[in-house]
């Protein structure tokens, strides 16, 4: 089996590719199937978020596999009003929803409850099968995540 152990800082020409959803691109140890049918194992540093276009390599530097962000079921909000888009980001972020933010557009994993909430704000929500590249904060490693005990001595409100 091919073991992919590093993400290249300067991508090389890919010899293969692998199409992965976000839920797999956040894992550091996982078995995957390359697009050519070969099995491979990801043995990557913990906390590494793979993006579409990243190139992974084996330890020997003889195989170069390009990551392709898989099409996923996402809700899509398009809006030309920055205030309304900010309002949507606020409410989705307050619910810790992994969110892809682009100029005039938001994407999140399809959820009819969230769709209905945003429609109540007057936004148009559609559905699509599209690549999903959420902000890294939604998938931060534990050492950088959002956690603390209630006995911590600082204010924090939602």
UniProtKB/Swiss-Prot annotation:
A single Gene Ontology CC term: cytoplasm
A Pfam family of this chain: UreE_C
Free-text remark on how the cofactor is bound: Binds 2 Ni ions per subunit.
Residues the entry annotates as binding Ni(2+) 1: 96
UniProt key word Chaperone: yes
Domain of life: Bacteria
UniProt KW keywords: Chaperone, Cytoplasm, Metal-binding, Nickel, Nickel insertion
Gene Ontology MF term list: nickel cation binding; unfolded protein binding
Biological processes, Gene Ontology terms: protein folding; protein-containing complex assembly; urea metabolic process
Function as written in the Swiss-Prot or TrEMBL entry: Involved in urease metallocenter assembly. Binds about 6 nickel ions per homodimer. Probably functions as a nickel donor during metallocenter assembly. Its function can be bypassed in vitro in the presence of high nickel concentrations.
Description of how the protein assembles with itself and partners: Homodimer. Dimerization is prevented in the UreEF fusion protein.
Similarity remark: Belongs to the UreE family.
Protein name according to UniProt: Urease accessory protein UreE
Organism: Klebsiella aerogenes
